[in-house]
Every structure is written in structure tokens, then in C-alpha cells.
Amino acid sequence: SELTMRQTLANAFGDRDFWLLTVGFLACGFQLAFIGTHMPAYLADNGLSPSVATTALGLIALTNIAGTYLFGVWGTRWLRKTLTVWIYLGRAAAILMLLWLPLSSWTVYAFAAVMGFLWLGTVPLTNGMIGQIFGMRYVSTLFGFVFLSHQVGSFLGVWLGGWLFDAYKSYTWVWILAAALSLLSAVLHAPIRERRAPVAAAAAA
């Protein structure tokens, strides 16, 4: 039989993999909120027109549709943690390439297309891992706790992005921090064990 909500929450809160998912998801929120809020100002500071920023955000939204769908499908075929690791590595690479390459409308569009494809692919994969590890009955409840970390990251991405810009008159350190968090999240997801959800009899034993 299935576990009760109390048993499921107790299992999750005492499980290393739940906390790896939770802490790792903070990086996702940081990156998405920082880019969505501060990228237009970053591009303007580097002499690019507002139309480049709006086009880039539109590209992110467009390619996100394909990325979210495909990562959801791929998560039924391959290990979700492995796909999630590749998402975070891809984001880090895209951010570092944006900083390294000469900034132009075309490099911005390329960055936006790649980042958009990787934008919300973490969501179906994270939900899938929670469901597989802890069972589907309370997956929404558990994802809510994990998503809280994402929203903390979102707050930090917006607030810290502005604070660091005011302190250093540049967004460079925020971009570097976003890439570093992405690499850290990849490391955190790598040891997650995707396994069958426990049942009440096993828990009682």
C-alpha cells in the first residue's frame, strides 16, 4: 500500500536525494530570474538596442516550448538526473560563451536560443525524479517544497543581480556567479539515486 502524507514527508525530509534536488533547484531560479530581469539592462549597457533584448526574450520563450517538451519525453527514456546535469552544464557553457565572445545581436540570439531550450527542462525532470523516488501520490506537495528553493533562487537572482551591479558597475560578476551555481547544481544532481518509491510495508519494516 502507499505511504501516508506524513510518512512520505518524513521519508523525503530525511533523504539525501531530496535535499540534493532542493538545493540544486536554487540555481535554476537564480538564472531564470536574473536573465529575465537584468539581461535587457546588461545589453543596453553594452550598446545594444532594446529591440535586441525583446527579441532575445522572445527567443527564450519560443525555444523553451520545444526544450520543455523534449526533456519531458527524454526523461522517460534516459536517467532524469543525467539529463538535468547536462542542462546545468549547458547553461554554464552558454553563459561563459556569452561573456567570452564579442557581444553582438547574433551572439545574444544564439545565447537566447540555447538558454531557452534549457530554460524549463528541469521542471519535468525534477517532478519525474520526485515521483519515482517518493511516489506519485504526493508529488505535487513534495515539488512545492523543492520549488520553494527555486523561488529563493529567483529572489537572489533579481536582488543580488542589482546589488552586485551597483557595487561593481558591471554585471560580469553576476554572470560568473550564475555559471558557478550551474556547475554546482550539476555536481549536486550527479549522485542522486533514481529508485523505486517505498511502500508502507517497507517503511514499517
Task: For the regions a language model picked out, list residue spans one by one.
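Cytoplasm-facing, short amphipathic helices at loop-to-helix transitions on the intracellular side
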Residues: F18, R80, M136-S140
